[in-house]
């Protein structure tokens, strides 16, 4: 059964691509374990704004595990310790009361940091715009690209899903 927990966050903060970054520590109290990880970051940002501080910059789009924009390192693992899930599919029930959670941007030469947890995905976006894709075996369920879908249909589907989460 989900309950409310208190967590300490160590969040990577970096003002720009050429600036030095550092970890900042924040305390969040009464976080419902049924909240998604991104909802928890939204709550942190609301708290920071109320305190007159800059919110943590992070990227997200679909919040459905499709787009990959929310990619983060959580406690040293891509997307957190859960396997087969993206950051937006991670829920706070994976954490315990009193846990310290370290949150870092996706670090790769191909994805330089823009600010805080947001990285420049333009190299990846160019591949996608050119019609490229990556086939990855995700386990027991059929791969998402097992049935070929024409690019035009996929584009229309993405347009229809663009408002989700807003």
Predicted regions: what they are:
Residues 1-165:
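Signature of N-terminal electron-transfer/Fe-S-associated modules in redox systems
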């Amino acid at each position: 059964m989900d309950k409310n927990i208190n967590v300490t966050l160590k969040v990577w903060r970096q003002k720009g691509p050429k600036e030095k970054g550092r970890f900042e520590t924040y305390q969040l109290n009464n976080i419902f374990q049924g909240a998604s990880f991104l909802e928890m970051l939204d709550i942190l940002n609301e708290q920071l704004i109320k305190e007159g501080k800059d919110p943590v910059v992070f990227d997200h789009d679909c919040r459905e595990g499709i787009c990959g924009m929310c990619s983060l390192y959580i406690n040293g693992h891509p997307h957190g310790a859960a396997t087969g899930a993206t950051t937006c599919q991670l829920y706070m029930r994976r954490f315990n009361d009193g846990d310290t959670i370290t949150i870092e941007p996706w670090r790769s030469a191909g994805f330089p940091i823009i600010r805080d947890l947001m990285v420049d995905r333009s190299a990846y976006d160019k591949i996608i715009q050119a019609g490229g894709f990556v086939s990855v075996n995700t386990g027991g369920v059929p791969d998402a690209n097992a049935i070929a879908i024409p690019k035009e249909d996929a584009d229309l589907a993405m347009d229809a899903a663009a408002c989700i989460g807003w």
